[in-house]
Amino acid sequence: MILTSKSTEFLRWAEEKEKNIPQNINELLVEIRDINNVKTTEITKIKEIIQTYNCCIYASNMDLKSNSNLLRFVESIGMKTYDCNNIDLNKISTITPRETSKVSYIPYTEKALNWHTDGYYDEKSIFSWLLHCVSPSSEGGENYLLDHELVLREYILRNDDINVLMEDGALIIPESKDTSRSEISTYIFSFSNAYKKLHMRFSMRRDNIASSTRASDAITRLKKIIESHCAQYSLTYKLCKNQGILTNNILHGRNSFKDDKVNRKLLRIRSYERL
């Protein structure tokens, strides 16, 4: 696809994308009877919604009995290989506040998370992820969601030239002393993957990213588009127990939260496959 505001191909894609903007969270919601034994019809519905919106929210009537059941569920959707992070060293990460000074990652605290895509700092691209709620926070903790394809659409319609944000050196991730990760230079938008679909690497946290001189102004415009022009497209939702989110690694964030007697606990799976 030619990515300019004057391209017939792009304008056709942009028009089709506009037709599939969710007007409310219910358009993303699928009721499933049992997360431990998801029916074929329920899986089909989830896949259809993800194909349309790059995101789906499911709600199970039954408690999750084991992590292996959750893995079987995501494999039926399309996940096959997984990112094992440095905290849990497992296919499934437990996202809950931790009382150890060794853990400085914001997801494992009660703090807010600004707009980002998962794994933007990794060499290998994360194409999809799941969050499953075991226990919600007593106050706050809402997730906010924004289809990255809508961000691309808005950027091109308002600025025309996207090429600088597709260069490998557009986004610079500083080295991490916590994980011994070297500095990474990468793209923000790319179609150069096996799926020929949009993949995005980005974070709104200023301490986490830098930019090339060429891309600096474009990134400033991108941030404005995410915060202002795309605000109408973002959806906010607080997961209840036995609910979850599946996405093609769209932009997302989290409000800060407070816990009462039971800590907020989510299970996270990140995959190298697109759904």
Residue ranges and their predicted role:
Residues 59-62:
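Structural motif
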Residues 48, 72, 163:
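Surface-exposed charge patches
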Residues 64-103:
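Long, hydrophobic, well-ordered secondary-structure blocks that form the structural core
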Residues 2-43, 90-239, 244, 250-275:
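Active-site environment of non-heme Fe oxygenases that use a 2-His-1-carboxylate facial triad
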Residues 47-56:
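TRNA-binding/sensing appendages of the translation machinery
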